[in-house]
Amino acid sequence: MLMTATGSPFLTAETIIVAADRAARAIPPLWPLASSVAVNPFIGQAGDTLPTAAARLRRAAGIALTMPRSWYAERLRSGEIAEGDLQAAFDAAPAELRPKTLAALKQAAHAQGTRPPALPTVAELARDLDSIDWPGIVNDRIGHWASGYFDQGQALWATAQAQRAYAAWRTVATHDLTPEIAGLAGFAQNVADAPADAEAALVRCVTRLGLSGAALESYFHRLLMTLGGWGQIARYRLWQAELTGNTDASVVDLLAIRLTWEAALLRQYGAALEPQWQAAIAAYARPVAATLEDGVDAILQEAAERAAQRRLHSLLSETPSALAAPGRPALQMAFCIDVRSEVFRRALESLDPGIRTLGFAGFFGLGIGHRRFGSDVVEARLPVLLRPGVFTCSGEATPAIDKADLTARITARAKRAWGRFKLAAISSFAFVEAAGPIYVGRLLRDGLALPRPSAPNDPAPRPADDLGFDTRLGMAANVLRAMSLTEGFARLVLLAGHGASVVNNPHASALHCGACGGYSGEVNARLLAALLNDRDVRAGLASQGIRIPDDTVFLGALHDTTTDEVTVYAADHPSVAHAGDLERARRWLTSAGVLARGERALRLPRAARSQDIPHRARDWAELRPEWALAGCQAFVAAPRERTAGRDLEGRAFLHDYDWRRDKGFGVLELILTAPVVVASWISLQYYGSVVAPDVFGAGNKLLHNVTGGIGVVEGNGGLLRSGLPWQSVHDGEQLAHEPLRLSVLIEAPREAIAGILERHPGVRTLFDNRWLHLFALDDEGHMAWRYTGDLRWENCSRDAASGRIPLRELA
C-alpha cells in the first residue's frame, strides 16, 4: 500500500533538495584515519543554545547533551559545585527555561530527568510490529556496501568510484537478496524500478512516505543520524569539495539510499503502520522547542563549568612559584598550544630561570601541502579550516637525493606487494605455513614491547617551488609577530612540533597535531627554522624592526607526546659555535622529559613509574598509551608570565600573545578565528564522546576493526564509528575527561575582542550560544570580565565569602 499525505501542499523537487542539504549540514564531518582530526560533533547546531540543541538531537538521535543528573548531584554534595556557582548559573539562565526558585533547581538536580527516545523511523516502527530487526538489517547492508565504496586502499578488490554513491549502491542492491531473505519482498526489484539519479529518488520516496514540508528537514536529519559515521564520511567529502569551490553529493546520495529502504518498508507493512507513521510525521513537523527539563540540565552544566572557572581564577591569582630570570634567555623553545605541551613546558622552565617557552599553533603559521620522502601523497599539514598555500617536499634536488628517493619508492612498493600477497584470497592460506617462521622474531619483539630500531628522519623539507623573497619575508614576519617573538632572542631557539609514537592503534593520527591536519609537526618546524636562518630574510626583518642577533640559530624539533622525548634536527643547520648551547639544551630536555613522564604516570593506569611510559608506547595491547587531550578545559592567550610557574595540570591550551605589540589587533583576530576554533572542536569532541558515547563516540577499542582504511567498526560490520573510543575518556573506573565546555581567556581590551566577534558571526555564535565561555583578563592576568553574549560583558571579581565570581555591572 502506498501512502501520500492528505491535505498537504505539493512539494517541489527544489524544496526537497534544499531540506536535504540543510539536513546534511546538521551532521559533523568525519576525517579518515590517515589524517583524523578532532571535530565538533555539534557543528551543525552551533546556531542553537545548549537546551535547544538538546531538544533537536533528542529527536534526531535519542541522546542527551549533558551528564546524568546524579553526576551533578554528587558534585553538589561534595562541594565541588558551590552554592554560588549554582546561583550564578541559575541567574544567567532564561527565565522560561529555569525552575521558579533555586530550591526547586536543587530538588530537580537530585531527580533523574526523563530522556524520551528519538522520533521513530519506518524501520523502527516495522521492527516493533513484527520483531524483525529492520534497523539492524538496514545498517548492516548499507555498511557492507559503504565500506567498499568509500574504501581508501584497504580492500584488495576495490569498488570503482566513477559513479555517484547512489548509482553505485543501486547496482549492488539490485542483486542483493539479503533483504528478501529477511522478509522484505521485492526489494531488489523495487530498487531496479527506482529513478536512476538520487534527486529523483528523493522526490519519489518523499511522495510515497507522505511527508509534509514541515517534516522534511527533521526527518532527513534523523535518517542521516541513523547512518552513523557513513553519513559523516560523506559530509567530509562535501567539506573537502567546498574548500576548493566545488561540491559533492555523497550525503544526498546516502539519504536517498536510506529513504529507499523506508519507502520499501512502508510499502510492505502498509495499513498496519499508518496510525503510528502519521503520528510520527506530525511529530517531525512540530518545531523544535527546548523544555524545562532541558533548561535544568543546561543550568547544572553551567554550574559545573563555573566551578571549574572559579578554581582557574584562583590559580591565576596566585603568586607564581618561580619567575624568569632577567636578561637574555639561555634557551627559547616554542611549542604547540596543545595541552600536553603545558606539562613539558612547566617541567623545562623549572630547570633553569633562563629558560623561556612559548606557545603557538603547531603548524607554525605555515599552511603547507607536504610530500614526504619517497611518496607522491600530498599531506595537508595545516588546520582543516584552511587550504594549503605553499607546497613542499623533503630533500634537495640533487642526484644523491633523487637516487635515495627512488630507492625508498621501490622499497615501499615491494612492501605493499608483499602485504597484498599475504592477504590475497588464495596465497594467504599457504603464506602462514611457508613464511610463518620468519615472523617469530618480530612476534616476540612486538609481544614483549621491546625497543624497535629508529627509522631514519626524512631529509630537511624545502619548498617544492622557489618562493620569492617578498613571500619568504612576509611569512617570517607574520609568524614572528603572531608568536609575539620580535625581540629578546636567545642564542638557541628551538621550534618544536609534536607527534605521538604508538603501535597497533587505528586512531594514531588523532594523537598527532590537530593544527597540522592530523600529522606530526616536525615538517612545519623545520621549514620555519630554515626560513628564520636565511640571511636575506633576517636582513629584511631588520628593516621591519625585527632584529635577530647574528649569533641566534633556529632549529626544528619534535616533541613526542607519548614518551616526552624530544628530537632536535641539529643536522639541518650545523653550527660549531652552538655546540655547547645544543648540548646543554639536550641535557635540559632529557631532564624535563623525566619530570613530565613522572607527572603523567600519576594519571595513567598501570604506570607507577616514569620508566613505564616508553614501554606503553611500544605495547601493542595497550589501550591507553597516553591521554592525549583528555581533561582540556581552558584556552589562554596572554603573555607567558600570566601562567608560568602555575600547575595547570595539562588542561590548558597556552598561546603566547601580547596585545601591546599587536597593532590593529590582526594577531588577536587570527587567534580568535583559527586556534580558538580548533581548540573548540577538540574540546567539544571530548565533550560529545563523554555525554553521548553511543552516537558521538567510537565505542570499545577491543572490538575495533578498521574498514576501508577510513574508520573503525565494532565487530565485523555495521555503522562506522566516529569520535573518541571510550578508553580515551575513561580509565576503567572513572572518567579521565570532565565534560566541560572550553573557557577562553584572552588578555586584550574588551573593545578589540568585541570588534572581532562582530566581524566574524560564525565565531561570535559559538560564544553567544555558550558553546564556549569567554573571559577578558586584566593587566595583571586576572579573569576580570565575562562575555555574556550580544557583545556585552559582566565584571567579575573574586568573592571569597560566597565562593563564586559574582556579577558586578554590565558594560
From Swiss-Prot:
InterPro entries: DabA. It is found in: Cell inner membrane. It is a peripheral membrane protein. One of its GO terms (cellular component) is plasma membrane. It comes from the Bacteria. Its cofactor is Zn(2+). GO terms for molecular function: zinc ion binding. Zn(2+) binds at C336, D338, H498, C513. Keywords: Cell inner membrane, Cell membrane, Membrane, Metal-binding, Transport, Zinc. Its main location: membrane. The keyword Protein transport does not apply. It holds the Pfam family DabA. HAMAP family: DabA. Forms a complex with DabB. Part of an energy-coupled inorganic carbon pump. Belongs to the inorganic carbon transporter (TC 9.A.2) DabA family. This is Probable inorganic carbon transporter subunit DabA. It comes from Rhodospirillum centenum (strain ATCC 51521 / SW). The lineage of its organism: Bacteria, Pseudomonadati, Pseudomonadota, Alphaproteobacteria, Rhodospirillales. The gene is dabA.
